[in-house]
Amino acid sequence: MQKRIASVVLLLALVTPLYAARPAKTAAKAAPPAVTVDTHADTPSEFLDHPFDLGILNTRGHFDYPRMKAGGLDAEFFAAYVPAKYANKGAAAYCMKIMETIHEMADAYPTWVRFATSTAGIRSAVAENRRAILIGIEGGHAIEDSLDLLRAFYRFGARYMTLTHTNTNNWADSSTDEAKHNGLSPFGKQVVLEMNRLGMLVDISHVADKTFYDVMEVSKAPVIASHSSSRALASAPRNMTDDMLRALAKNGGVAMVNFYPVFLSDEVAKASKARDEKLKPEIAALKAKDPSEGSEYQEGVRKLMAANPLPKVSWTVIVDHIDHMVKVAGIDHIGIGSDFDGIPSVPEGMEDISKLPAIPAELKRRGYSDADVKKIMGENFMRVFAEAERVAKEMQTAK
């Protein structure tokens, strides 16, 4: 595997043309149709551990291509999630492995989807009556403190990177770990600027509040929160405060609402914490049997969670978060980032990606215009992505 990864890295410079976006053929001056975008799904991690046919309707998980079509979703960012256990060794190799898996997940189903790396690529896929698959790296430890690796991952298709996951890394503090840098370290600021130069979106989901505000000061391009909800409605530390939402709006960025009930409801979060405490001995026993936290461990945890369900929350709570965040940040700065296949439970009525149309329908019921709904469902993200592309060209030209 290491030899294969090394070979892939050496060939990265040749990879980009294979995945270059072809501009859609549209009438002169005609506005392109609105697209729907979900900025975070962890389906690749599921696929890596338990491969399945994405081209047929499945009963497991939250995502496959028929359900993507049924949900009216035009573009999905698959997360190249790098578990924190790789932070000290093997993070880059694992990241390359899961990115390669994402390419395979797209390339094996050409009638359904195409791989994309740009706004033009997304719109081109829609024009071809296909859907777009993109890559976002989850966990900045993936780059192993190397700007060269960051550039290599960009060439292999990554178009955003979540600066931290649940762990504080060597250059950025996480919202759910010990602070070591008082936000971003000097190298962390270099990472943000290099992401700006490349055209890779800076994702502030999971980061500590101070890290977020440091990014606001440093970034030359608008940033995203790929899967974060409102802390005013649910007090999870990885959710965004109203002040953070206002700062993000000033930056020109966009925050995507997460669908995980624990991040939507304090009642569910409290029950989840109690359940975790109750199941701690059993989970420890599973980890002792499978220290690598592989498929045996994951399946055992799934069974424990299923046997100890959390309180139910309605899918309309997702829209409550959208509504509040729009009121704080403005209509141009909110989107959706489901976290499907990365969350152990979902709201009732939002069991998988096929249920997505309920959200725009509810937004319209609450008085949102068609134009505003299109912004929330994808066009806000597309605007930010396009601006990041513009800033990158400007920075590259300036040197």
Predicted features along the sequence, with ranges:
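Distinct, well-ordered alpha-helical segments
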Residues: 146-150, 211-221
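Alpha-helix-loop-beta-strand connector modules within alpha/beta enzyme cores
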Residues: 181-197, 215-225, 359
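Substrate-binding cleft of carbohydrate-active enzyme catalytic domains
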Residues: 193-204, 210-211, 244-250, 324
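Bacterial N-terminal signal peptides
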Residues: 7-17
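Short, contiguous, pocket-lining structural segments
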Residues: 180-187, 203-208, 240
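N-terminal hydrophobic targeting/anchoring segments and the immediately downstream early-domain regions
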Residues: 20-182, 231, 235-399
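Positively charged n-region of N-terminal signal peptides that target proteins for export
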Residues: 1-4
